[in-house]
Amino acid sequence: MSNAEQQAPVQQDENQLIAERRAKLAEWRKTGKAFPNDFQRENTAAKVLEGYGEKTAEELEGLPIEVKVAGRLMLKRVMGKASFATIQDLSGRIQIYITRDRVGEEVYADFKTWDLGDIIGVTGSLMKTKTGELSIQAAEIRLLTKSLRPLPDKFHGLADQEMKYRQRYVDLIMNEETRFTFRARSAIVASIRNYMTGHGFMEVETPMMHPIPGGASAKPFVTHHNALDMQQFLRIAPELYLKRLVVGGFEKVFEINRNFRNEGLSPRHNPEFTMMEFYEAYANYHTLMDFTEGLLRHAAREALGKEVFVYQGRELDLSKPFHRLTINQAIQRQHPEFSDAELADPEFLKAKIKHFGEPLKPGGLGSLQLQLFEACAEAHCWEPTFIIDYPVEVSPLARASDTNPEITERFELFIVGREIANGFSELNDAEDQAARFQEQMKAKDAGDEEAMYYDADFIRALEYGLPPTGGCGIGIDRLIMLLTDAAAIRDVILFPSMRPE
């Protein structure tokens, strides 16, 4: 039997259930009371359970307490003149006890026709069942919203991973783990924001549409501004605008917002993603490594109450000092047989990149060293590791080292083999920056779609004088993945990019 043949009866059953629910809605409309909006919820499930869950049945009987809760009908057991139901709100679930004698024969008859997924409001007193479960004994119960689509089967509907992404609203209804992930995401972002403002950073908003794409090596999305009759690009990074603000005197700025890169989908990549970038005058890359390390620990501790996690079955400890290695040191940690001389030999590097099965990209010595690191060492940076001192060739916006002009004062932070942050001492020499932009334009002319454009206005800003500055970008989505044990980036983005159905 084909997959389509297996799905056909399921689809027919669903269509029949939807038709039955629509018929119920039509009858409800006739009463003139469909979709009321006058029910005032006063309690959440969690607050009721927290406040009264430990009280005995006798104690509850002596309390003249009335509660008003509302939520989605998730379970329902009709037993003659009495029934049990469970409703779910954002805070959790609570059981409702409904009797015909208490709510009235007409309301009880209506209740028996309600479907799982309907949203209801309940007013009543508190009681304990024979099994000791805190429940609400309904004095009044109302249908607030009719659900026209049946909830998926717990064991089949939720097994479809793609359905979770396409219909996140259903996933959130059915899956407590998903709800936890996105509550945790919100808490982590809030803790990051609090840390930044607590350290004197000002939050700003910079343009999402740029006349010139810049701030990162990536392929942009292109659009057209009708009123201005000009081509614009969805931003790939806010970096150049944030540095303009430092030129203007805002010495500590940050932004948490979306970036857009017209590139592929993978477990680690989504074309639309969330980044935080921050810049601090009179700081350097050493300062920012220390700051970033403290920020990540704070976010984990503040939002989730711990610094040691299990990620995909393996322990991840953020409490220990983060490692700091150069690109060559990271390569030699995995392959101590590679000598310093060999890692400075372009032909050796090309051969090893091919040996590890990676396609060779155009570039000079610095690019080849980075390609080899990505091929054989990056995935092994499980513990938090700052890879430092990147070649100038692959760091067009970073300040060159005073001791070695071939490398820059740049770091990337890797955790569980994934890049989480990228930062550097900013290049504040306008003439050097202009020359590097020219080199990037040559690379673009040679076919490198990710090479940067020449941004004349940014050069003009630098000519007014950018103080010594450190800057860093942190991938919020990848950080959330680590802290919530999510295997794919789409698990931590509410509505990820998807191919058409």
UniProtKB/Swiss-Prot annotation:
Cofactor (UniProt): Mg(2+)
InterPro entries given in the database record: Aa-tRNA-synt_II, aa-tRNA-synth_II, aa-tRNA-synth_II/BPL/LPL, Lys-tRNA-ligase_II, Lys-tRNA-ligase_II_N, Lys-tRNA-synth_II_C, NA-bd_OB-fold, NA-bd_OB_tRNA
Protein location: Cytoplasm
Record-listed Mg(2+) 1 binding positions: E412, E419
Binding site for Mg(2+) 2: E419
The reaction(s) this protein catalyses: tRNA(Lys) + L-lysine + ATP = L-lysyl-tRNA(Lys) + AMP + diphosphate
GO biological process: lysyl-tRNA aminoacylation
Family of this protein: Belongs to the class-II aminoacyl-tRNA synthetase family.
Protein name as catalogued: Lysine--tRNA ligase
Organism: Dechloromonas aromatica (strain RCB)
Name of the encoding gene: lysS
